[in-house]
């Protein structure tokens, strides 16, 4: 090679260049990112991979790629957006999961704009760990950001349920979907009994 660097080995017939978690090829001085490296073939995915490589080369940080929280959006009308596991994937990996939903037709901003098609759907474990989220509707790609952040940082569903969201915005849909996780507890027979018991002291 002209650069005096040993080339990376790519098996014949392989559709992409094989890399490790740090995006290094079989020659550890050569990195591969973007479509040639396989994985999610999105512009934002290539940008994420570039950041991993820069941290490894320039700052000598052992940065590793993790595509578990890589968002994807289909720019149709309405938009389709997803991050993390689907319901089917989650049920295969976990014994029990909860499905949280909230429709845009319950959102005041969507009503005001007369664009109420769509909903937010989230998949969580019984203890509130977020596994994935899907959104269909106007600006679905933009609304996916908090779910992507939660998955990336390992935040539980309570983090999204407790965040203060400006009114009226479509962002409230995600907050309400997250809050749906607590509905069985808030409206359970036990909770009603506690409320009745406490109200007795106010008489």
Located regions from the model:
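A short alpha-helix-loop-beta-strand transition element characteristic
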Residues: 6-11, 60-71, 95-100
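Internal hydrophobic alpha-helix adjacent to the cofactor/substrate pocket in enzyme cavities
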Residues: 44-67, 96, 151-157
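Small-molecule pocket liners
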Residues: 15, 71-72, 120
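Short secondary-structure boundary/capping segments
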Residues: 21-23, 65, 112
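FAD-site-proximal beta/loop scaffold in flavoenzymes
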Residues: 1-59, 161
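Flexible, glycine-rich terminal cap/loop adjacent to redox cofactors
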Residues: 75-86, 91-203
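Short, flexible active-site loops
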Residues: 33-39, 67-76
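Short, flexible turn/loop "capping" segments at secondary-structure junctions
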Residues: 25, 29, 66-68, 126-127
């Amino acid at each position: 090679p002209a650069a005096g660097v040993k080339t990376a080995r790519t098996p014949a017939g392989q559709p992409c260049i094989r890399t490790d978690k740090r995006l290094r090829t079989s020659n550890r001085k050569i990195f591969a990112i973007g479509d040639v490296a396989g994985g999610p073939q999105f512009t934002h995915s290539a940008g994420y991979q570039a950041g991993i490589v820069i941290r490894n080369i320039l700052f000598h940080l052992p940065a590793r790629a993790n595509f578990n929280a890589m968002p994807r959006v289909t720019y149709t009308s309405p938009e389709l957006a997803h991050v993390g596991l689907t319901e089917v994937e989650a049920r295969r990996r976990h014994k029990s999961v909860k499905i949280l939903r909230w429709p845009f037709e319950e959102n005041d901003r969507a009503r005001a704009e007369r664009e109420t098609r769509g909903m937010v759907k989230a998949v969580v474990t019984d203890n509130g760990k977020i596994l994935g989220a899907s959104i269909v509707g106007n600006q679905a790609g933009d609304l996916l950001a908090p779910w992507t952040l939660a998955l990336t940082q390992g935040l539980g569903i309570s983090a999204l349920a407790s965040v203060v969201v400006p009114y009226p915005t479509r962002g409230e849909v995600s907050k309400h979907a997250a809050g749906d996780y607590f509905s069985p507890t808030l409206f359970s027979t036990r909770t009603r009994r506690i409320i009745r018991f406490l109200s007795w002291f106010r008489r």
